[in-house]
């Protein structure tokens, strides 16, 4: 089977959102129908995440597996030939089994655009047309309240039954203005349903002088779904960009993936400092984080130094079983080198608890 990574742009006005609704009018359903027409086989399109009805995308990422092998350029042309003119494939790449469009996401950027100048008929589907002028400087004052890790229960519509933990990390929010259009850029690994649109609505209300920027703290502290808030119109929101980890091994329960200093928004437990210290002490080595697949909890790290590789377990109960599951994939990558030594697994005390194949030349 071949795996292809695709980047798609779309204007969401005419569609029920990304996820299949069994009505045939979602972006996912349309893409699946087109690709199945080309491959003559059942295809499952998996996106980086959902966008709601009316929401746009400049660079939504999705993947699909197929027996049909074609050059990326031909795939792009073939799919676009059958798509409506408000959905367009921007890029296609062949990927290996370690790539996953949803689980390998490092962060996403959503932009919310507000026109607070004269009504613009040409941008009505991609920019919210605000009927009054907004105080941009007041809006900027609200940004620090939402950046960082907070409980966003009051600022999303995801049910507590489905998502009991509604703590999320917003990496950054920036506000720019050009020609009467305000752009709010939100960056984070993941957002709850309507979370970005509700945050945008808060900024709009501040811009209208409905309340002071400090009111955001009251909203966050309330931690309840019944707290009064609005959801800003869908057309102003665009999924702008999706960034991915380089991944060396992937399983249903975990992965070994790229690690960069400052990557604390994805590693959710206290063992992060151990990995960061190892990186500082061995700057010439390559380091990868071994994490759970969904929550990105750090269970250990993978270190490579000139053909020698080792897995260091930071949380033994789950880390050692996961390391042994991922070991064959890591071995396969090392075997592509002319010389490599066995991969050893160390526990927190520095004791070898397992190792891979015998030294090979």
State where each predicted segment sits.
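Structured-RNA-binding interfaces characteristic of tRNA pseudouridine synthases
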Residues: 1-246
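N-terminal basic, amphipathic alpha-helical segments
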Residues: 52, 263-266
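Short amphipathic alpha-helical segments
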Residues: 52, 275-276, 327, 331
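Acyl-donor (CoA/ACP) binding surface of acyl/acetyltransferases
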Residues: 247-260, 287-361
């Amino acid at each position: 089977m071949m795996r292809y990574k695709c980047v798609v742009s779309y204007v969401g006005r005419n569609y029920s959102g990304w996820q299949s609704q069994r009505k045939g009018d979602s972006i996912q359903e349309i893409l699946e129908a087109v690709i199945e027409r080309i491959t003559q086989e059942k295809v499952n399109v998996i996106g980086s995440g959902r966008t709601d009805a009316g929401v746009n995308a400049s660079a939504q990422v999705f993947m699909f597996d197929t027996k049909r092998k074609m050059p990326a350029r031909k795939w792009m042309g073939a799919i676009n030939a059958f798509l409506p003119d408000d959905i367009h494939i921007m890029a296609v790449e062949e990927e290996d089994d370690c790539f996953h469009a949803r689980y390998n996401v490092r962060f996403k950027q959503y932009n919310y655009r507000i026109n607070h100048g004269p009504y613009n008929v040409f941008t009505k589907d991609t920019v919210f047309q605000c009927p009054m002028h907004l105080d941009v400087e007041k809006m900027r004052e609200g940004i620090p309240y939402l950046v960082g890790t907070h409980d966003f229960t009051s600022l999303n519509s995801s049910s507590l039954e489905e998502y009991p933990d509604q703590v999320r990390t917003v990496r950054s929010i920036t506000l720019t203005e050009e020609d009467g259009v305000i752009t709010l850029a939100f960056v984070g690994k993941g957002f709850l349903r309507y979370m970005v649109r509700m945050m945008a609505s808060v900024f709009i209300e501040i811009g209208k002088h409905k309340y002071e920027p400090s009111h955001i703290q009251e909203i966050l502290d309330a931690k309840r779904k019944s707290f009064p808030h609005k959801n800003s119109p869908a057309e102003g929101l665009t999924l702008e960009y999706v960034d991915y980890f380089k991944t060396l091994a992937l399983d249903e329960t975990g992965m070994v993936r790229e690690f960069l200093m400052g990557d604390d928004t994805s590693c959710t437990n206290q063992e992060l400092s151990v990995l960061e210290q190892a990186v500082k002490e061995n700057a010439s080595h390559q380091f990868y984080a071994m994490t759970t697949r969904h929550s990105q909890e750090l269970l250990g790290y993978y270190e490579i130094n000139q053909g020698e590789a080792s897995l260091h377990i930071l949380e033994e109960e789950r880390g050692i079983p996961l390391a042994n599951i991922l070991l064959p994939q890591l071995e396969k990558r090392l075997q592509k080198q002319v010389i490599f030594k066995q991969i050893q697994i160390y526990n927190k005390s520095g004791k070898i608890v397992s190792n891979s194949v015998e030294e090979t030349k």
